Amino acid sequence: LYPAGLCTINQREVGRDTRSFSSGLRAALREDPDVILVGEMRDLDTIQTALTAAETGHLVFATVHTQSAADAVDRIVDVFPGERQQQIRLQLSMTLRAVLSQQLLPRRDGPGRVPACEVMRVDGAIRNLIREGKTPQIRNAIQTTGAVGNILMERAVQNLFQGGAISRETMERALQGLPDAGPLAGGMKPRL
């Protein structure tokens, strides 16, 4: 935690400074912040307030526990009742800029972990898929659209193996937990 004073970071601790994530987020909006970091979006009120903050021009960073970028979109939408989900898809499609999904994998060369990151930068194609509720097609869009920097988790894991950062065993374990991971990089060799 950062102590108050001359810092440029103002924070609220749930339980000490505010009753809940959503009430702390609403209070923060009254202070006209440039950037908002929400530790975790777990409930409808917090997600709705974060979406509203993004719509009003704030840069909002938040975490959601999911396996992939497409799962993050579904998790956010599924928190809301059915009659509101189309509105939330529309809000999300207009405000979401990127999703980074990560796994921390054991390093091959010693202690510690290395992040494998799926990156989804939202372009026109992905924006339309979100708006139309076609999240199962997002995986394909990440792989084929022109957004620079997009990468699926399985490619990120394979790149770590090829770069020598993780072992074959670690790569295979990580790929087994992924949907549609395709063939397990049988012919791949690490570059050492």
Where are these regions (language model features)?
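Short, flexible helix-loop junctions that flank or precede catalytic/ligand sites
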Residues: 1-192
